């Protein structure tokens, strides 16, 4: 990227063009690499160095008579933790989804953020199976006892990470690991389950760890993969929880969701202009 070693050469080209009127300097920007680790001293020092380098180039541009009109440097992490570098604009990315830049910084509520996206589906087939029943491809999950299973009609073709599969097979070559968390809205109240076996192209399966009839779980019940909850410990899974289950980050959980999943927009009429509303399917506006 652009480093201090290139400042003089860049200004030597920019200044004549600006004086000729063929170049108008509107903005100056850079991107912080490790602003999402405010508790790691070496990363804080690295961010401080980036900030000072940015300010140094601003001073050089001003001295050359071509000051930038708009400066923007702060990503979500810096927007939340470094108000002194907000300058004229900030660039919250994951913050627009209502999430902190990294779980190490806290939770959305730490910064008065509210997660803006909820991913829901309805249960497909619910059926009873015996103990030792293999679930999904590869039999990487065996039911430990007589139980019921339920299909969730979302898969990796929809952007559900295959790496969020759940393995539980004694003696298998696969390491036992929990799958992605799912909140099932039962007639007896919400319950938390996990992906059992491999995520398939169009679906994944839940082991309900009991009789569906006794648990009050039926085909068509609503399920929530993530939403504005407090986390899987409260049976309210978040995108951060799915990021951990899939060995990735919430950014990827959000941006991998495919267009096969219908979008519904809450409060759209309150926040969007008539021009933007016209771009949406009326049936998607709640």
PLM features per residue range, with description:
Residues 1-130:
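Active-site loop/helix belt of alpha/beta enzymes
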Residues 130-286:
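C-terminal accessory subdomain/extension
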